[in-house]
Amino acid sequence: MAFLKKSLFLVLFLGLVSLSMCEEEKRENEVEEEQEDDEQSELRRSLWSSIKDMAAAAGRAALNAVNGILNPGEQ
């Protein structure tokens, strides 16, 4: 009977350790995914910022070109 109790405690202990290790690995994976998401969000923000700046510059250039065509003597 004592052998059975020790075996049962050993199995329960090993199961608990295994579960703990799985939970820890799961948390680490979630943290890594969050970091990757943060990096991707930052890249998207910088990309959109660059696109916005280029569009603004293109708009200003187009406006200047139109003004130059409509008012050739005022430059």
UniProtKB/Swiss-Prot annotation:
One of its GO terms (cellular component) is extracellular region. Antimicrobial peptide with activity against Gram-positive and Gram-negative bacteria and fungi. Has been tested against E.coli (MIC=47.25-128 uM), S.aureus (MIC=189-512 uM), K.pneumoniae (MIC=189 uM) and C.albicans (MIC>189 uM). Probably acts by disturbing membrane functions with its alpha-helical amphipathic structure. May penetrate bacterial membranes, but stay at the mammalian membrane surface. Shows a weak hemolytic activity. GO terms for biological process: defense response to bacterium; defense response to fungus; innate immune response; killing of cells of another organism. It is found in: Secreted; Target cell membrane. This is Dermaseptin-SP4. Residues 23-45, 74-75 form a propeptide. Belongs to the frog skin active peptide (FSAP) family. Dermaseptin subfamily. It holds the Pfam family FSAP_sig_propep. The keyword Chloroplast does not apply. Residues 1-22 form the signal peptide. Keywords: Amidation, Amphibian defense peptide, Antibiotic, Antimicrobial, Cleavage on pair of basic residues, Cytolysis, Fungicide, Hemolysis, Immunity, Innate immunity, Membrane, Secreted, Signal, Target cell membrane, Target membrane. The modification Proline amide is found at residue 72. The lineage of its organism: Eukaryota, Metazoa, Chordata, Craniata, Vertebrata. Expressed by the skin glands.
